[in-house]
Amino acid sequence: MSIAEIKKNAEAKMAKSVEAFKNELQKIRTGRAHPGILDQVHVDYYGSNLPLSQVANVTLIDARTISVQPWEKSMAQKIEKAIRESDLGLNPSSMGDLIRVPMPALTEERRKELTKVVRHAGEDSKVAVRNLRRDANDQAKKLLKDKLISEDDERRSVDEVQKLTDRVIAEIDRLVHGKEAEILAV
């Protein structure tokens, strides 16, 4: 394995870590509606536990309301029940075969709670990135120990991985601040 491969590998893993963090942030409810918030809702479909997106069409009506259109009319009650029983704190209402899911306004206390959750998730992502940095540096040290690279090459590799880590952590911080601003906006 070369230094370039170590750096490329670390970069790919760090990008995956940031992508996972973005997905985690999407699941955190803010005052605004977005279809992704219902991704974690599963519905009993003839004995199978399926994600909501596989049994219904989920769209936005406006900034605070999600529309769920079941593909089978008989599923409307099961979908409504699954949304209500999820830990999202949502109260869907059924209008025939269309289910409307209004997003309740967040209380100040809940907003502060959610910002703590966002910060904690951000810290967890940073720890994951730092662990990837450590792994990459350990690989470079092993190459040095096996005399496959010089000390200068090892030092250069450590510096490049550190710059990459700093850039990724800055991206995570930017995402955290953006989500906090979104949560705290009334």
Curated annotation (Swiss-Prot):
Record carries keyword tRNA processing: no
Protein name: Ribosome-recycling factor
Gene giving rise to this polypeptide: frr
Superkingdom per UniProt: Bacteria
Main location: cytoplasm
Organism: Leptothrix cholodnii (strain ATCC 51168 / LMG 8142 / SP-6) (Leptothrix discophora (strain SP-6))
A single GO BP: cytoplasmic translational termination
GO MF terms, alphabetically ordered: ribosomal large subunit binding
Compartment(s): Cytoplasm
Protein task: Responsible for the release of ribosomes from messenger RNA at the termination of protein biosynthesis. May increase the efficiency of translation by recycling ribosomes from one round of translation to another.
InterPro entries assigned: Ribosome_recyc_fac, Ribosome_recyc_fac_dom, RRF_sf
UniProtKB keywords: Cytoplasm, Protein biosynthesis
Gene Ontology cellular component terms for the protein in this record: cytosol
SUPFAM superfamilies: Ribosome recycling factor, RRF (SSF55194)
Family: Belongs to the RRF family.
